[in-house]
């Protein structure tokens, strides 16, 4: 677990690094960032202390992916959405329930010890009647995951027990069909709602985005895109970002992608979010769950 530092230190770190580099940096959904070790890839896991109060500036030790210019999700509409927590109430990544005892998240969200919260709408630690709490007992990143290249950015997490299916907690199917340009999708998460400032929402945020052609994706990020990724966004500057990493991209009722990485600051014109392309991994997901159940 990374050591918590004052929030101003991380803001100052990000600003100084940006000035020194003189270029726009890429944001990952959750690697720890340190001023002692500047990197061209800025992590975007949230590590927000939920006890600090929803909507306040981050009390975190790294950056995190978030929903920029989204809106409050309707309650009970994202029952597969999970929060990965460090300590009692520190959000660091999103995840998706894909099986009664298994989650998918981004491989760069891997931690040794963490808790999982499902069925919760607010970012606050206050108990909600639909919530279910779990321990993550096994994390299995894809064997082809590479950092900082971000290829194959997915990981399976086994829960310590099966979920109790309710209106607030249920799995979603992973799509076996790859998305086409123009497909309308929805991304959700509790990540920061401003960039480069850090400001966390009170409740789960949702955003409608459109899948872009692979050419537009490659043009936006030359020599950084492969077929394990796809880009999505819109012209109005709406995007996922820090704190949303590992969260779901749902298209036509199925799980199509996971929040992976993107530009920093987020929600910049012609710099879309980049998502793990799950249609390429359905066999690995099924076989891994079967082999470890």
UniProtKB/Swiss-Prot annotation:
- GO annotation terms (biological process): amelogenesis; cornification; epidermis development; extracellular matrix disassembly; positive regulation of antibacterial peptide production; positive regulation of G protein-coupled receptor signaling pathway; protein maturation; proteolysis
Q: What class of enzyme is it?
A: hydrolase
**Record has Electron transport as a keyword:** no
* Glycan-modified residues: 69, 173, 208, 252
Q: What is its EC number?
A: 3.4.21.-
For the region Disordered, what residue ranges are annotated?
37-68
Please give the tissue specificity annotation from the record for this chain. Answer: Expressed in skin, breast, brain and testis. Expressed at the stratum granulosum of palmar skin.
- The leader peptide range reads 1-22
- Which family does the similarity line name? Belongs to the peptidase S1 family. Kallikrein subfamily.
Q: What is this protein called?
A: Kallikrein-5
Q: Which organism is it from?
A: Homo sapiens
